[in-house]
Amino acid sequence: MTLSRLAAAILMAASMPAIALVSALPAAAQTAEHTLTGNLSLATDYRYRGITQTDRRPAIQGGFDYSHASGFYFGNWNSSISWLSDSNDAVSAPIEMDFYAGLKNTFGADGRWSYDLGVLQYYYPGDYPANFTRPYTTEIYAGVGYGPVSFKYSYAPTNLFGFADSKHSWYADLSANVPLDVWGLTLNAHVGYQKVQVANASYVDWKIGLTRDLGNGFALAVAYIDTNADRTVYTNAGGRYMGRGTAWASLTKTF
C-alpha cells in the first residue's frame, strides 16, 4: 500500500465516525455538553511502550475524541504500522485502529486530582496466515493523576499483541507533563513496565522530552525513547532490534 493510500485510509477511519457524530448533534450542544476534537500527526517513528511499530520509519497517525460534560468519552485513533509484516512477510496488516471509551473527571477540594477508567480495543485489519496468532488485544485501564503527574494501570484479559498464551499481561505507566512557562514548552517524562506472561518478554521503557505549543492547534514534540527489552524476543525477522533507544519527533495538528 502506498503512503498516499495509507494516509487516506487513516484519515477516512478517523473522520467518518466524527462526521456522523457532528451531524447528529445540535449546533448549540456541540459547544456546551458535547465536545468533539480531531488530530493528525506525522512522526519520525511510531513508538508504543518503547517498541517501534514501524521499524524505525515515519508514521502517519490520526483520530477523533468525543467527550460529554459528565466525563464520559469515546474515540478512535489510527496509525500506519509495519511490525506485523516485519515479523512475518506473509502478513499484510499496515494499519492499527484503536477504539476506546471510558469515564474521566476531576475531584478533590482543589480539583487537581483526576481519575480515568475505560476499555481499549486494538484492531489490526489485514490478511494473516492460518497459524499466525492474531494481534487483536483488549485492555481495561484505570488511572489517577494529581496536577501534572499521572499513573495508569492497563490489564489485558486477552492475549497481548500476538504473544500466544499471554492473557493477563499488564502495563504500569508513570508520567509527568510539566509546563515550563517559557516558549510554550512542556517537559514530558515517562517510565513504564510491560509485564508479558511469556518468558523473557517483560521490559521497562522510558522517555524524556519536550513539547512546544506552536499555536493554531499545532504542537511539536521531541524526545529520547529507550527500553531494556530482550533482544532475543524483540528482534524482527529482518534482524533489527525493535527496542533500541532513539531520538524521536512528531508534529501534531489538533482541530
Regions found by a protein language model. Give the residues of each.
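Outer-membrane beta-barrel architecture
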Residues: 63-65, 100-102, 118, 141-143, ...
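Cleavable N-terminal export/targeting peptides
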Residues: 1-35
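Surface-exposed loop and membrane-interface regions of Gram-negative outer-membrane beta-barrel proteins
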Residues: 69-134
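Outer-membrane beta-barrel "beta-signal"
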Residues: 208, 212-214, 239-255
